Amino acid sequence: MNTSVTEFVIPDALSVTITDDTLCVDLTDGRTISVPLAWYPRLFHGTVEERNKWRFIGKGHGIHWDALDEDISVEGLLLGKPSGESQASFKRWLNTRGN
């Protein structure tokens, strides 16, 4: 049986746009990935100000929100992976915010 290996090159993030219900990330290969904000509960429950204070990590391999303690990788976005945070962890975080 022959198998072939396909190299999967992960592009870097160029820009991030967040609306009330969508996270959009423009990539260096020309694609734009849009996912439901509900996939990332910390972003969903964050304020507009908190959502807009992001920075690239790993030279564009990911995005970090300091105030929300959230990290999202470009690879995870491309693979369609929502947040892997447990409900218990998220509830603890939400309780620290007084929600």
Predicted regions located by residue number:
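Motif-centric detector for short Cys/His coordination patterns
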Residues: M1-N99
